[in-house]
Amino acid sequence: MALKHFNPVTPSLRGTVLIDRKELWKGKPVKGLTEGKNKSGGRNNHGRTTSRFIGGGHKQSYRYVDFKRRKFDVVGTVERLEYDPNRTAFIALVKYEDGELAYILAPQRLKAGDQVVAGARVDIKPGNAMPLSAIPVGTIVHNIELKQGAGGKMARSAGTYAQLVGKDSGYAQIKLQSGELRVVRGECMATIGAVSNPDNMNQHMGKAGRSRWLGRRPHNRGVVMNPVDHPHGGGEGRTSGGRHPVTPWGKPTKGYKTRVNKRTDSLIIRRRKTGK
């Protein structure tokens, strides 16, 4: 999909750059593959804010997307590509030979009429899914499982991908876009190709209201708050915060390591680049 640049006929259109979605399905999603969705406003079951600056936005329905791809050796035809408000990538409606319908993450270069299939030995083309052990080294993949049968967890956002760089003693070595190099069991599934909508990062909303439609509220810096609200708050006039950058709860930020999952440390060969 191309980017759509707007002429400044109104102040809010000046500088606005959006994704041109004219090739996507303009109707409603398949009702049997959707479910109602309640907004949390960033609050948990106690009513406390667990994710700040979230709230409002247009009402959405959740689309069931097949991240597992366990329908082996049944060819499916792509009926159409659709917009999904729950993710940055586009989704593809697939109709299998037995009549079943399913949504999958749409990879780049996939279009209506193409055929996709999942299996132990299938063609290396975008949209096909297979175990990492059957994929040639050097292939670009997405929607990668971390645990066999649990469904894809890595490389699912718009434009993302990972590269299979090696295989050794039942494990596959995956290089992520962050620079991290990690190993995954060879039985885990992955889908060929990179995720659709790579221009998502080049969008420019143009006005605050467009972010509010997406459920994003204004993001306030700590230095403009009061001392009761943030460690950087307070002071007469504009201040720099007076201390090293911390979160609202006093923990160091900007490069501070927070990873605590020691159980899977052995599966990470090289940590991601942090810019420090």
From Swiss-Prot:
It comes from the Bacteria. The keyword Coiled coil does not apply. GO terms for molecular function: rRNA binding; structural constituent of ribosome; transferase activity. The keyword RNA-binding applies. One of its GO terms (cellular component) is large ribosomal subunit. It holds the Pfam family Ribosomal_L2_C. Transmembrane segments: none annotated. Keywords: Ribonucleoprotein, Ribosomal protein, RNA-binding, rRNA-binding. Residues 30-52, 224-257 are annotated as: Disordered. Residues 41-52 have a biased composition (Polar residues). One of its GO terms (biological process) is cytoplasmic translation. PANTHER family: LARGE RIBOSOMAL SUBUNIT PROTEIN UL2M, RIBOSOMAL PROTEIN L2. One of the primary rRNA binding proteins. Required for association of the 30S and 50S subunits to form the 70S ribosome, for tRNA binding and peptide bond formation. It has been suggested to have peptidyltransferase activity; this is somewhat controversial. Makes several contacts with the 16S rRNA in the 70S ribosome. Belongs to the universal ribosomal protein uL2 family. Part of the 50S ribosomal subunit. Forms a bridge to the 30S subunit in the 70S ribosome. This is Large ribosomal subunit protein uL2. It comes from Gluconacetobacter diazotrophicus (strain ATCC 49037 / DSM 5601 / CCUG 37298 / CIP 103539 / LMG 7603 / PAl5). The gene is rplB.
